[in-house]
């Protein structure tokens, strides 16, 4: 069991809700009765906008089971917040773009008119149990944030006759590279050879001139400057770093397909040869990678390329390059 640190909010003289952080990759919610209370639950981790707020590894599931598990750890109360309140007798699901640092799990529980938050900081795959005291009957909401730049997925549960004692198990998968799935990336057809690809975590993702700058780069000197290991998540069709960071590519704001920055507009397809092709999600039309003189990896749509007549006008050092693993 990993060593973890806990912070928990609670009130006395009330039933217990147990939140257990475990490991592995699950995507569905299972429902069972908790001391004869009928629980209704919902979960949504779908994309809601730009790169930073789109669903990525890790996913999780919430399981409701009977009774209290022996050997659980009780964490004592420290403080309380009343923000983000959920009304009684309402089931609802929400997704936001809030995120926290890698290797941190945050579970937020709303009951009646109060909000409680548990933060567990430890290894990439925290495994342990925390015990939460719910002060009022009615509904409670569990919210999980895991890793960096991933959405908050919220599950609201309504009991049939008040809040019942029981266990809520939050299963959080390990996320990232393994010897079997990790690789380096390179750019083929770049004017600099070899051209290695890396994500610069210090590069601001910002709007600059006509473009929205990303943090994915090709080396400018033919060396491995800051070279990353990556892996491919076929569920979200993206290349991610080993700590589950999602690189962003530079785009033109006026690009009618991807200029809005929404990740739902495109997918990254990996073929059997390890070549990654960006495509429009609506019709699988190919998008194009380019590299500018600063090493930024750009992406453009065919619609935008046609409008401006020639990518040569954009002062790229290489047009229509190929992203490939090695």
From Swiss-Prot:
Residues 1-21 form the signal peptide. Sequence repeats lie at residues 103-137, 138-175. GO terms for cellular component: external side of cell wall. It is found in: Cell surface. GO terms for biological process: flocculation. Pfam families: DIPSY (PF11763). It comes from the Eukaryota. Residues 164-326 form the DIPSY domain. Keywords: Glycoprotein, Repeat, Signal. Its main location: other. Residues 103-175 are annotated as: 2 X 36 AA approximate tandem repeats. Glycans are attached at residue 25. InterPro entries: DIPSY, S_pombe_Mam3/Map4. Induction: Repressed by the srb8 and srb9 transcription factors. Belongs to the mam3/map4 family. May be involved in agglutination during conjugation or other aspects of colony formation. Induces flocculation when overexpressed. This is Putative cell agglutination protein pfl9. It comes from Schizosaccharomyces pombe (strain 972 / ATCC 24843) (Fission yeast).
């Amino acid at each position: 069991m990993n060593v973890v640190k806990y912070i928990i909010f609670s009130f006395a003289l009330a039933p217990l809700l147990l939140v257990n952080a475990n490991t592995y990759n699950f995507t569905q919610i299972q429902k069972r009765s908790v001391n004869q209370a009928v629980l209704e639950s919902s979960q949504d981790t779908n994309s809601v906008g730009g790169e930073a707020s789109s669903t990525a590894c890790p996913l999780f599931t919430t399981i409701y089971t009977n009774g209290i598990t022996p050997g659980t750890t009780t964490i004592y109360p420290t403080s309380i917040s009343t923000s983000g309140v959920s009304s009684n007798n309402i089931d609802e699901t929400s997704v936001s773009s809030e995120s926290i640092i890698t290797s941190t799990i945050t579970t937020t529980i709303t009951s009646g008119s109060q909000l409680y938050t548990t933060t567990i900081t430890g290894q990439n795959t925290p495994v342990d149990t925390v015990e939460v005291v719910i002060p009022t009957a009615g509904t409670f909401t569990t919210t999980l944030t895991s890793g960096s730049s991933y959405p908050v997925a919220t599950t609201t549960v309504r009991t049939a006759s008040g809040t019942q004692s029981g266990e809520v198990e939050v299963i959080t998968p390990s996320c990232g590279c393994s010897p079997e799935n990790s690789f380096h990336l390179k750019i083929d057809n770049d004017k600099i050879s070899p051209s290695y690809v890396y994500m610069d975590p210090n590069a601001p993702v910002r709007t600059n001139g006509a473009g929205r700058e990303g943090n994915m780069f090709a080396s400018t000197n033919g060396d491995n400057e800051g070279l990353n290991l990556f892996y491919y998540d076929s569920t979200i069709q993206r290349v991610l770093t080993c700590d589950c960071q999602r690189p962003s590519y530079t785009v033109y704001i006026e690009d009618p397909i991807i200029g809005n920055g929404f990740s739902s507009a495109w997918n990254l397809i990996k073929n059997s040869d390890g070549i990654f092709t960006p495509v429009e999600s609506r019709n699988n039309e190919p998008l194009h990678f380019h590299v500018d003189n600063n090493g930024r990896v750009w992406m453009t749509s065919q619609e935008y390329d046609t409008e401006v007549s020639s990518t040569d006008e954009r002062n790229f050092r290489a047009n229509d390059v190929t992203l490939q693993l090695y």
